[in-house]
Amino acid sequence: MYDVIVIGAGVTGCSIARELARKERQILVLEASSDICEGTSKANSGIVHAGHDAMPGSLKARLNVRGNQMMGELAQKLQFPYRQNGSLILCFEEENKGKLQELYERGIQNGVQGLQILTQEELRKMEPNLTDNAVAALYAPTGGIVCPFSLTIAMAENAAENGVLFQRNQRVTAIEVMEKGYRVHAADENVYEAAIIINAAGVHADEIHNMLPAKEGHQEMHLIARKGEYCLYDKKAGALVDKTIFQLPGKYGKGILVTPTVHGNLLIGPTAVDIPDKNGVNTTGEGLETVMEKASVSVKKLPPAKQIITSFAGIRAHHESDDFVIEESKGYAGFIDVAGIESPGLTSAPAIGEYVAQLVNEIQALPDNKDFKETRQGIVHMEQADFEEKQKLIAQNPAYANMICRCESISEGEILDAIHRPVGATTVDGVKRRTRAGMGRCQGGFCSPKVVTILSRELGVPMEEIRKSDQDSVMLYGDTK
C-alpha cells in the first residue's frame, strides 16, 4: 500500500508530489495520458500572475501571491526558464479608470508589491507599440512569464529523483473505500491502494470526486470546461512587446493578452467559451478571428498572420465558487480534492504543493526525508552553450554534434537526454516539450521523422508503435514498399 496516490500529473499534481516527497512516504502519481503535462498544463498562457485579480481572502489570492514569490528561486533550483518581465492591465476609457484603482487596491490587500497606475505618457515610454487608445494602465512589476512544460517536467523529474513513482497511461476508472484507505482501479485492470488520495485530475477532477458516493460531507461536484484558443507567432514577432499586456478583466477571465514567451515568440489569446466536451481542444476559425481582433485592441499593429506558426486550444476547469477547491472531504477521511484549478493555477502550483502537503502532514505524521534533493539538473541546450561547453559536450557524446531540429537548434544529444531522464519522453510530443524539437517555424516538418527514429531505437520498439502523443495518435502504419 502506498502512503499517497496523486491522481493527475499536470503542474498541480507534480508540484504536490514534489512537496510530499519531503517526508519519508511512498508516493504514486497516476496519469491518464501517455505523458506528464498533457492536459491544461500544456495549453495555457505561461503567465506568472502578480496576484491583483483574485478576490482578497480567496485561495486564489493567497496561493497566487505565494506562488509568484516562490517562482524565481524554484527556477534557479530546478532549472526551468522564467523571466519577471512585469505586466500591464490596459484601460481604454476615462470612465473605467476607477476599475484600475479597484484592481490596484485589491492587489495591495492581496500583498502584491510594487503596483503602480501609469499615465498615458508613462505607458508610451514603457511600451511604444501599444495602441494610442490606452489612456492608463496598472503596472505590476512582479508579473512574469514561464515555460509551463518546463516547469511541470522539472517538478516531475525532481519528484522522481526523490523517490516518487510515476505511472502513465493509467486512467482511473473507479475508487473503492477500504477500512483504512482506498483502492484505485485504473487502465489495464491495474489496482493500487493508498492511505490518502489526492485528486488533482484537472478538468476531470469532478469525475474522480464523484467516483465516491455522495453523502453528508461529500456532495457531488461539477466543473465547467472553459476553452481558450491561442495564436503563437514566430520569434520574428517576439519583440513587439516586453511586458505581458492584459485588458481590464471581465466575467470569464482576464481577457485577450499579448505577451512575449520565455523562448522569444509572441503569444496572443485566449478566448473563454464554456463547452460540454472536456476534450474539445479543437481550434475554430471564429475563435482565432476573435483572438486576433481583440489582441489588435491592445497594440498598434499585430504582425502579419503569415508569421503565426501554430494555433492551439486548452481547457481550464472552472468551479461555481470561482475559487480553487482544495480540501479534505468531510465525508471521506484522507480524500483530498484539488479542483477548479484555473488561472492563476500555473502561478499558484508551487504554493498549492505546499498547501496540500500541509494538509497531508496533519493527517499523516511521518519523519522528514533527510535525503530530499532540492535541485534538478536541466537539459543542457547546445544553442545556449558557449564554444567551450559545446566542445566538451561533443567530446563526451558525439550525438551533440548531430543537429536534429534546425529551427530550434536541438541536437540528438539533447533528445537522448530527454528520453533517458526520470519520467523520460516516450512520444514525439514528449520530446518536443522537453527539448523544443518541433516547436519552431516548421513545426516538426523536418525533425519529426528523425525524432521517431531516435525514439524507436532508444526505447527498443518498432517505429509503428511510436506515437505523437496519446495512444490513438498513430504516426506510422507500416512500410510503403
Where are the regions that the model predicts?
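Short beta-strand to alpha-helix junction loop
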Residues: 55, 62-65, 90-99, 138-157, ...
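Iron-sulfur (Fe-S) cluster-binding segments and ferredoxin-like electron-carrier domains
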Residues: 279, 411-422, 445-463
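N-terminal Rossmann-like FAD-binding beta1-loop-alpha1 element of flavoenzymes
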Residues: 2-29
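C-terminal catalytic lobe of FAD-dependent flavoproteins
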Residues: 253, 262-263, 274, 279-403, ...
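Dinucleotide-binding Rossmann-like beta1-alpha1 core, especially the glycine-rich loop
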Residues: 46-126, 255-256
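Helical element adjacent to the flavin cofactor pocket in flavoenzyme catalytic cores
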Residues: 138-196
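Flavin-dependent oxidoreductases
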Residues: 15, 175-180, 184-269, 273-284, ...
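Glycine-rich FAD pyrophosphate-binding loop
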Residues: 21-43
